């Protein structure tokens, strides 16, 4: 049986609930990240930190793999700063999913490109 749920945007939630920035966005949406970000254009302008569960495989139609999420968010002014919780597929130990952490591309972390 199909279950119908209302779809609302992140921007409308923030506006309707008078939420004040700065924002942190955490997504664990199994391939639905782009439509969510598309509904968060204003919220993203006031977001400093994003955590996204990403995949190394195409898990859904139009889903983005981890490197594509990095490219997509870089276009929005964010860069990946950390990774955690890698999960490996049981049948062949292939890297399946992990969380990526993003901060603003103008954060002081990125002012130095050297190791030391």
Outline where the language-model segments fall.
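Glycine-rich adenosyl-binding loop in Rossmann-like folds that engage adenosine-containing cofactors
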Residues: 1-8, 12, 17
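Conserved acidic-Pro-Pro-aromatic motif
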Residues: 13-116
């Amino acid at each position: 049986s199909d279950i119908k749920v209302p779809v609302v945007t992140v921007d409308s939630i923030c506006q309707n609930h008078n939420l004040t920035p700065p924002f942190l966005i955490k997504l664990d949406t199994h391939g639905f990240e782009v439509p969510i970000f598309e509904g968060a254009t204003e919220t993203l302008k006031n977001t400093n930190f994003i955590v996204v569960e990403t995949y190394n495989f195409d898990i859904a139609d139009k889903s983005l793999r981890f490197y594509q999420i990095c490219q997509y968010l870089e276009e929005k002014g964010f860069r990946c700063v950390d990774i955690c919780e890698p999960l490996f597929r049981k049948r062949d130990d292939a890297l399946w999913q992990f969380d990526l952490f993003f901060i603003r591309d103008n954060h002081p972390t990125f002012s130095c490109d050297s190791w030391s």
